[in-house]
């Protein structure tokens, strides 16, 4: 049985004070759920968030990292630095990183390898644009991303990787893939993992859906056979909405 995982991606939102208030508001309910809860905070809030979480079951996530250990990379942060702060999960390949910062599948692959080396658990984001979807290229795009992003990743490492299917056309737009459509693509991702590795790995890897997930549609999405969780954007910024998803 795959344990559901709900991750909130705050993007460039929340001050340290707002982060601490949010943690205080959700901690009790998030502690009693059987769902794994992850908060992907801005870099500036990670240290204080970790202190506030303490021995909580809620996991801490970061939103980006560089693939080098150190060096002349102004504005970047390394996996080792994140690990030192107590980070558990790391978003890699989010569509906004790919779109606005020219992140490629090759750099995504480097980041995954470095994250695993530092015992961070990657949440690998993949998904197609509206144009690619309308051109019936969704499966081709996903296959290319999975093939390159996981190049050289050993079978034993797959237990530490979460995959998030986030159709780019559904992020921040209010549009959502139907639960059936999302499950169809996620089942295909699971098939790709089976072909690359084996049945055991494909049946244990957790695959989330991301794209305008909110309390109103969380139950329907989570009831699909192959969907193991959600990567939540806007709805993760409000405690009541986020808890509504966590308690689907």
Curated annotation (Swiss-Prot):
<dbReference type="GO" id="GO:0046166">
    <property type="term" value="P:glyceraldehyde-3-phosphate biosynthetic process"/>
</dbReference>
<feature type="active site" description="Electrophile">
    <location>
        <position position="94"/>
    </location>
</feature>
<comment type="function">
    <text>Involved in the gluconeogenesis. Catalyzes stereospecifically the conversion of dihydroxyacetone phosphate (DHAP) to D-glyceraldehyde-3-phosphate (G3P).</text>
</comment>
<dbReference type="GO" id="GO:0006096">
    <property type="term" value="P:glycolytic process"/>
</dbReference>
<dbReference type="InterPro" id="IPR000652">
    <property type="entry name" value="Triosephosphate_isomerase"/>
</dbReference>
<feature type="binding site">
    <location>
        <begin position="233"/>
        <end position="234"/>
    </location>
    <ligand>
        <name>substrate</name>
    </ligand>
</feature>
<protein>
    <recommendedName>
        <fullName>Triosephosphate isomerase</fullName>
        <ecNumber>5.3.1.1</ecNumber>
    </recommendedName>
</protein>
<keyword id="KW-0963">Cytoplasm</keyword>
<dbReference type="GO" id="GO:0006094">
    <property type="term" value="P:gluconeogenesis"/>
</dbReference>
<dbReference type="GO" id="GO:0019563">
    <property type="term" value="P:glycerol catabolic process"/>
</dbReference>
<dbReference type="InterPro" id="IPR022896">
    <property type="entry name" value="TrioseP_Isoase_bac/euk"/>
</dbReference>
<keyword id="KW-0413">Isomerase</keyword>
<comment type="similarity">
    <text>Belongs to the triosephosphate isomerase family.</text>
</comment>
<dbReference type="InterPro" id="IPR020861">
    <property type="entry name" value="Triosephosphate_isomerase_AS"/>
</dbReference>
<keyword id="KW-0312">Gluconeogenesis</keyword>
<dbReference type="GO" id="GO:0004807">
    <property type="term" value="F:triose-phosphate isomerase activity"/>
</dbReference>
<keyword id="KW-0324">Glycolysis</keyword>
<feature type="binding site">
    <location>
        <begin position="9"/>
        <end position="11"/>
    </location>
    <ligand>
        <name>substrate</name>
    </ligand>
</feature>
<dbReference type="InterPro" id="IPR035990">
    <property type="entry name" value="TIM_sf"/>
</dbReference>
<feature type="binding site">
    <location>
        <position position="212"/>
    </location>
    <ligand>
        <name>substrate</name>
    </ligand>
</feature>
<dbReference type="InterPro" id="IPR013785">
    <property type="entry name" value="Aldolase_TIM"/>
</dbReference>
<feature type="active site" description="Proton acceptor">
    <location>
        <position position="166"/>
    </location>
</feature>
<comment type="pathway">
    <text>Carbohydrate biosynthesis; gluconeogenesis.</text>
</comment>
<comment type="pathway">
    <text>Carbohydrate degradation; glycolysis; D-glyceraldehyde 3-phosphate from glycerone phosphate: step 1/1.</text>
</comment>
<dbReference type="Pfam" id="PF00121">
    <property type="entry name" value="TIM"/>
</dbReference>
<dbReference type="GO" id="GO:0005829">
    <property type="term" value="C:cytosol"/>
</dbReference>
<comment type="subunit">
    <text>Homodimer.</text>
</comment>
<feature type="binding site">
    <location>
        <position position="172"/>
    </location>
    <ligand>
        <name>substrate</name>
    </ligand>
</feature>
């Amino acid at each position: 049985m795959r344990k559901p995982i709900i991750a909130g991606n705050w993007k460039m939102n929340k001050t340290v004070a707002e982060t601490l208030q949010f943690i205080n508001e959700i901690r009790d309910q998030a502690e009693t759920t059987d769902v794994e809860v992850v908060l992907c905070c801005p870099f500036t809030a990670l240290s204080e968030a970790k202190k506030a979480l303490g021995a909580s079951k809620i996991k801490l996530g970061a939103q980006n990292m560089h693939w080098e250990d150190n060096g002349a990379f102004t504005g970047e942060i390394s996996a080792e630095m994140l690990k030192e702060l107590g980070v558990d999960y790391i978003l890699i390949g989010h569509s906004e990183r790919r779109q606005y910062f020219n992140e490629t599948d090759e750099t995504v692959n480097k980041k995954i390898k470095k994250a695993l080396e530092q015992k961070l658990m990657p949440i690998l984001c993949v998904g197609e644009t509206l144009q690619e979807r309308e051109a019936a290229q969704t499966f081709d795009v996903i296959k290319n991303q999975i093939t390159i992003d996981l190049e050289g990743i050993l079978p034993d490492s797959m237990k530490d990787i979460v995959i998030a299917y986030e159709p780019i056309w559904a992020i921040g737009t209010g549009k959502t893939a139907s639960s059936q459509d999302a499950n169809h693509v996620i089942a295909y991702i699971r098939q790709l993992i089976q072909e690359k590795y084996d049945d055991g790995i494909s049946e244990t890897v957790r695959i989330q859906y991301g794209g305008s997930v909110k309390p109103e549609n969380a139950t329907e999405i989570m009831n699909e056979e192959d969907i193991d969780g959600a990567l939540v954007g806007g709805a993760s910024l409000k405690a009541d909405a986020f808890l509504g998803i966590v308690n689907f």
